[in-house]
C-alpha cells in the first residue's frame, strides 16, 4: 500500500512554514496519541503523523522529499552507504577521469577495511522525559560479523578464493558507447559483488554473507533538555565494519509527545491559566502548575486577560548545562456564563459608577464582554 503524501497527513500545504507544520503536528499528535485516543487505528495514525513530521520538520529531509517524493533513512548521517545516484554511467569527476585516462589512478582495494553503516533509531519521549532526561534501553536490529566464519563467509576450514571474473579487483571494465565515442567504464563485478572473492563452500550459518542480523540491546542516557527532532550519536553502535573496519554509529532521533497543558518553545515553557473576573479585578494568589512542581503566583488587581507573568528558572534545563529556561504564565479571565438577577444587578450598579451604559436587551452586554475578554 502506497504511503500518503506527508503534507496531506499533516493537513498543510506544500508551502507551509516550519511553524505551521509544527502546530499541525502538535494538534494531530494530541488527537491521535494512543494514551489519549483508544479508537481502532489511532496508533497507526499517530505513527503516520510522527513519520510525516520527522521528514518535514528537518529542512534537509523536507528538501529531499519535495524533490524525490521520499526520504533516505540515512540522510544526514555520514559513514553509511552513501546517498545520491548509483548504478551505471558517471558517478562523479573521478569516474569521468577514469573513463578518459584509463581508470588506473583510482583503483581501490576491495578488501581494505571499511567502516560499517550508520543506523537511525526514533525514540518517542513523553514531554517531561525530554525535559529531565532518562535512562533507556533500546533494541536495535543490526548486521554483525558471523561468529561461525568470523566474517569470511566461507565454511569453517576453508577460505575464500580470488574471483575468477575480476581477478580479485572487485570491478570489471565495460565498453560503452557515448556521444564522445566508445569508452571504457568501470563497474562493480556482479559475480563477487565487489569483494574480489569467490566462496566455493559457504558458511552454513550466514550462507556466504559473512554477516548476520542480530538484535542488540543498547543502554542510552537521554540528556535533560532534548527537544523534538534533535538527535544524539552513540559512537560505535552502528553496523559492524567490513574487512576489520570500525563499526558505524547509531543516531537516536527524538520525537517528543506534546503535553495537553504545557507548551514548549526552545527552553521556555508557556501555559494558559484561567482566573475569575473577581480575581482579575481585586487581585489574588493562585497555584500554578510547572514541570518542577506547584508554584504560588500573585495576581495584581486590575489584571487583564492575556497578561503574561514570568516564573524564572521554571522552564527546561539547558541541554549543555548552565542554567534553566523560564515558564511564562498567560492568564485568561473567565467570564461567568450564567448569572442570577442579583448578580446582574450588582454588575449594572458597578457599570453605572464607571459611566458605562448597560442595556442587556439591545446591546448584548454580556456577550460583548465575553468577546472582549477572549480577544475577539
Curated annotation (Swiss-Prot):
Binds 2 Zn(2+) ions per monomer. GO terms for cellular component: cytoplasm. The keyword Metal-binding applies. Zn(2+) 2 binds at residues 163, 166, 189, 192. It is found in: Cytoplasm. It comes from the Bacteria. CXXCXGXG motif repeats lie at residues 146-153, 163-170, 189-196, 203-210. Its cofactor is Zn(2+). Residues 5-69 form the J domain. One of its GO terms (biological process) is response to heat. Keywords: Chaperone, Cytoplasm, DNA replication, Metal-binding, Repeat, Stress response, Zinc, Zinc-finger. Its main location: cytoplasm. A zinc finger (CR-type) spans 133-215. Belongs to the DnaJ family. Homodimer. Participates actively in the response to hyperosmotic and heat shock by preventing the aggregation of stress-denatured proteins and by disaggregating proteins, also in an autonomous, DnaK-independent fashion. Unfolded proteins bind initially to DnaJ; upon interaction with the DnaJ-bound protein, DnaK hydrolyzes its bound ATP, resulting in the formation of a stable complex. GrpE releases ADP from DnaK; ATP binding to DnaK triggers the release of the substrate protein, thus completing the reaction cycle. HAMAP family: DnaJ. The J domain is necessary and sufficient to stimulate DnaK ATPase activity. Zinc center 1 plays an important role in the autonomous, DnaK-independent chaperone activity of DnaJ. Zinc center 2 is essential for interaction with DnaK and for DnaJ activity. This is Chaperone protein DnaJ. The gene is dnaJ.
